[in-house]
C-alpha cells in the first residue's frame, strides 16, 4: 500500500538539507547518505547521490524517471553469483 498523498513524500531532514545546499552552490560532488528510505523528489534531478548498500556507497545519478521511487531501489544489497553447475552433468 503506497503512502497517503495527504502526508506527502518522506525525505530525511539531513538529506534534504544536503540537497538544498548542493543546489545552492551548484556542487557536482556526490552526496553521501545512508537513508535508503527517502523518496526521490524533483529537487534531486541531476544530482549524484551515494547510497549505502550495507557494505559500500553506490553512486546513483538521479534522472526524471526515478522521481517517486525510493533511493534504496537503485543500490542493490544482494549480489547473485549464478547457480552452481551440476557436477554429474559434466561427466
Curated annotation (Swiss-Prot):
One Pfam family of this chain: Ribosomal_S19
GO cellular component entries: cytoplasm; small ribosomal subunit
Keywords: Ribonucleoprotein, Ribosomal protein, RNA-binding, rRNA-binding
Superkingdom to which the source organism belongs: Bacteria
GO biological process: ribosomal small subunit assembly; translation
Extent of Basic and acidic residues compositional bias: 9-19
Gene3D superfamilies the record matches: 30s Ribosomal Protein S19, Chain A
One MF annotation (Gene Ontology) recorded for this entry: structural constituent of ribosome
SUPFAM superfamilies for the chain: Ribosomal protein S19 (SSF54570)
Renumbered residue ranges of the record's region Disordered: 1-32
Record carries keyword Nucleotide-binding: no
Record-linked PANTHER family: RIBOSOMAL PROTEIN S19P FAMILY MEMBER (PTHR11880), SMALL RIBOSOMAL SUBUNIT PROTEIN US19M (PTHR11880:SF8)
Record function comment: Protein S19 forms a complex with S13 that binds strongly to the 16S ribosomal RNA.
HAMAP family (UniProt xref): Ribosomal_uS19
Assigned protein family: Belongs to the universal ribosomal protein uS19 family.
NCBIfam families recorded: rpsS_bact
Protein's name in the database: Small ribosomal subunit protein uS19
Source organism per UniProt: Acidithiobacillus ferrooxidans (strain ATCC 23270 / DSM 14882 / CIP 104768 / NCIMB 8455)
